[in-house]
Amino acid sequence: MRRHDPIVAIASAAGRGAIGIVRVSGNALGALAQALCGRALQPRMATYLAFRDARGQPIDQGLALYFPGPHSYTGEDVLELQAHGGPVVLQLLLARCLEAGAGADPATGRPCLPGLRLAQPGEFTERAFLNDKIDLAQAEAIADLIDASTEAAARSASRSLSGAFSAGIHGLCDALIALRTLVEASLDFPEEETDFLHQADARGQLSRLRQALGAVLQQARQGALLRDGIEVVIAGQPNAGKSSLLNALAGAELAIVTPVAGTTRDKVQQTIQIEGVPLRIIDTAGLRASDDEVERIGIARSWEAMAAADAVLFLHDLARAQTPKYIADDAEIERALARKLPPGVAVIDVWNKLDCVAAPAELAAPTAPTESAAVPPASARPAPAPRPAVQLSARTGQGLDGLRRILLEVAGWQSVPEGICIARARHVQALQMAAAHLEQAADQLQARGAALELLAEELRLAQNALDSITGAFTSDDLLGAIFARFCIGK
């Protein structure tokens, strides 16, 4: 399988629709277009015609569009056949393309398009990248635009697709190249009396570059949050109102709510958005000791979900909060949270059923008794940082806005002006790596003397990290992993 083979695929979504598209990309598609359409096509003009099989029998009627390269999506010749969006019709058109490609061109006697094959997922966009129609960040933005779950994510992906995010990276690279030029000049001409670095204020340039990179990194973190969101698990004792809270946050009756404890046996999840940030909210089985095998399986899955989450809403029932058994059971869950949750999982105490009590309670996490005498007394230990806490009523909606604010804070979301671009975790990692190398470069520049070679190397590594974002410096393995996630035909 070669990158220059002509390729064909159904480019529209699977299933039935008003319109379906079959797309072909390759070099010299004129003969194939003639065979498929029965006439020569005028470039970049839609032609209405009948699509016929090899025997001249009609398949469908629709539009044919021909885009000669390099002025096309892929940079190669592109042919699009737009027909009615029935799966059978599109499969017939796809088969006809493959058949016509292998068939003889009446003018030459050779195949119309030798080597025409089915495209791999993302191969059309990969060719656009390889032919310099878009860079790697823009290619990823196409997939992110298709997969966007919120309006904010879609608009941010569109800005990245337009090249706004890449422009910021290119600006950093340009400043970095200018700085590298000074360092290389100092290395290549050590006998010169001119101090290139001092004369050009290399320290000032590096400081400004680090500040600019920090700003791009902060925006990239926000862009990645818009794309990926966070996963939040609702946990607590049975009948604390977990399913009611899920329904309240989702604004729909997704989970069954009854007075019977243990109604939820398995995970129920829904994606919501708060200020454009997607949050996957998961309702789980109530945590308690149980002899019911099915319920025990559900509880085990609850703990698995919590361990994989970004945040856990530990739900407490204000109506039962003063009863000894409830206090003891909550404390047992608290001990299990401390034992089972990995570092980094935020726990938020949510006191539900505010509508069932006469006055708000004093917010505090359940006390988990120590299990070992070896644990130092509280007076000898530093006080733990207070956990976020909120009182609310899932039934009336009172306090939900406060919970939403806390969730955004836990996610790390900051209100940013219009113009944020979508980003991915790999972009954030690359920017962090570049920042680390620039920090090392600043240390070397401060030392000066024999450290110029190390300074030059740190700057080179920083540029490699930035170039990996746009694809100027990228391994084939990374390209394969990125484009394999695209749908076929894109």
From Swiss-Prot:
One BP annotation, GO: tRNA methylation
NCBIfam families xref list: mnmE_trmE_thdF (TIGR00450), PRK05291.1-3 (NF003661), small_GTP (TIGR00231)
Name by which UniProt lists this protein: tRNA modification GTPase MnmE
Residues that bind GTP: 239-244, 258-264, 283-286, 393-395
Binding, (6S)-5-formyl-5,6,7,8-tetrahydrofolate: 23, 80, 133, 490
Name of encoding gene: mnmE
Cofactor(s) it depends on: K(+)
Cofactor binding description: Binds 1 potassium ion per subunit.
Description of how the protein assembles with itself and partners: Homodimer. Heterotetramer of two MnmE and two MnmG subunits.
Group of enzyme by EC: hydrolase
Entry keywords, A to Z: Cytoplasm, GTP-binding, Hydrolase, Magnesium, Metal-binding, Nucleotide-binding, Potassium, tRNA processing
GO molecular function annotation: GTP binding; GTPase activity; metal ion binding
